[in-house]
Amino acid sequence: MRLSQMLFVTLRDDPADAEIPSHKLLLRAGYIRRIGSGLYAYLPLMWRVLQKVSQIVREEMNATGAQECLLPQLQPADLWKESGRWDTYTKAEGIMFSLIDRREQQLGLGPTHEEVITAIARDMIRSYRQLPLHLYQIQTKFRDEIRPRFGLMRGREFIMKDGYSFHTDEASLKETYQDMYKAYSNILRRSGLAFRAVEADSGAIGGSGSTEFMILAEAGEDEVLYTEDGKYAANVEKAVSLPIDAETSRFTTYEKRDTPGTETIEKVCQLLNCSPTQLVKNVLYQTVYDNGKTVLVLVSIRGDQEVNEVKLQNELTKLASEYGAKTIISLNVPNVEAQQAWTTKSLPLGYIAPDIADEYIAANKQIHSKFLRLVDQTAVDLKNFVTGANEAGYHVVSANWDEQFKLPERVVDIRKSRPGDRAIHNPEQTLQSARGIEAGHIFQLGTKYSQAMGATYTNEQGEEKPLLMGCFGVGVSRLAQAAVEQSYDNDGIIWPVAIAPYHAIVTIPNIKDAQQVEVAQKLYTELNQAGIETLLDDRDERAGVKFKDADLIGIPYRIVTGRAIANGKVEVVERATRKSQEIVIDEVTTTLQQWITAAIDVKN
């Protein structure tokens, strides 16, 4: 392609609304164009990158025996109501775009396709002889993000590969899960990316287990905790660990202490000269279920620990049926204004004890009359601890469970693991932290959707059984931007060779020099005929502008038909290393073929 004929406009300055390097560079280099909040046009260079990523994904999926298809983006609400996720996606998380058609039928723009594929399986799979089966698609998805940001990282429209598998038993499901683990590792490796596979929370998708594939980058939204022995890695939302040991309490006699102005852990520890590891803090949450029922949740946890709200939400979702509900609509720490809707009197915030009286909750049929009390294991293990006295300005010291306070019935793991914690598999290993961009996620769904939607098959004994399912997603457009976030410098993008829009760019420093133009045309033709995807910068611009643009767009190899042609050579510059060398004109094609093959093969 000739740049003079291409839609190619670069920017010298960073766009004001771009926050992270990859977003800035893709806009500046003319790869994408913002159309609206969270909405981007993929311009010609970007579309080539996306096609290459998609092809790698397609090859790896096909190699496992998965079959490509294409599912409708518009989905009937009735299918989502069958699975029980309509309210979760339109009210709780609120990420699904929903609409009503002219027949007054509710529809959703698909953020994911579990319901559609399960309905297809329900209608078409009859016998165990048809299983296992794995279908996938590469398609545009939609999410009504609260705050779209970071370009293609968190947009309202994005390209994704999503696959769904069906099985007769756990062994078959796990085999496909492992196949996908290998395939996803291959996809990222072939794309030239450094990544880490980590244990993950299954979120609204559900299922018994899942793994995320994190592209390592400082701008990543996710925190990954891992051990240096390589035996443990998890998203912080899912991570488990051993906290530091609690210090021995300095208190031996139970008593109430005057502690004015100590609403925070730090202040009470300073006043009482004690460690936060010897304090039980009690955090109040307000959760609303999909049937409108509000439940007040009191979480007791060791003073130096933080509540993992993803783990907490999972625990509360498990309890939904006890309140006549299916799922959670919202979970938050209620502010004073929110508390006024259900309290009979002001709460002693900062001084709440594990036994705060249920009488604080006003009588209301939409509000559960008692606090749901949960305790983290870190608090259960404490002796002679400090905690609130249910009275503003006072704490108690040397308290114990089953003496001064009844231990809550529900003991749960809801603490947030953090760097420095000890690993469970080997306490001598401590957790390290890294930032990551989630590029892929694989799930073992089990029968979550098949049971809810009546998708069954007949086994060898003639019995009707629910299908076991797996679900596997790769963010194609996110992966492409993540590659930029992982590899750039002050001058622009450094694309991995395998997914670069073009392998090489031939730059003519002076288009008025007939010899430069002739050599450039010759190389441009030869390289493309040899399968080396090549751009020709034949614009009437200064050489410096062309060199800067070549660096900005990140094409792996730049060939310059400058002064060296007098000696039968051209200058070839490798973008990643900036190494420059002069190569005989007739040897350029074979040399680049070798370099490109080596760069791609090293990732396979």
UniProtKB/Swiss-Prot annotation:
GO terms for cellular component: cytosol. The keyword Phosphoprotein does not apply. It is found in: Cytoplasm. CDD domains: ProRS-INS (cd04334), ProRS_anticodon_short (cd00861), ProRS_core_prok (cd00779). It comes from the Bacteria. It catalyses: tRNA(Pro) + L-proline + ATP = L-prolyl-tRNA(Pro) + AMP + diphosphate. Keywords: Aminoacyl-tRNA synthetase, ATP-binding, Cytoplasm, Ligase, Nucleotide-binding, Protein biosynthesis. One of its GO terms (biological process) is prolyl-tRNA aminoacylation. Homodimer. Consists of three domains: the N-terminal catalytic domain, the editing domain and the C-terminal anticodon-binding domain. NCBIfam families: PRK09194.1, proS_fam_II. This is Proline--tRNA ligase. It comes from Nostoc punctiforme (strain ATCC 29133 / PCC 73102).
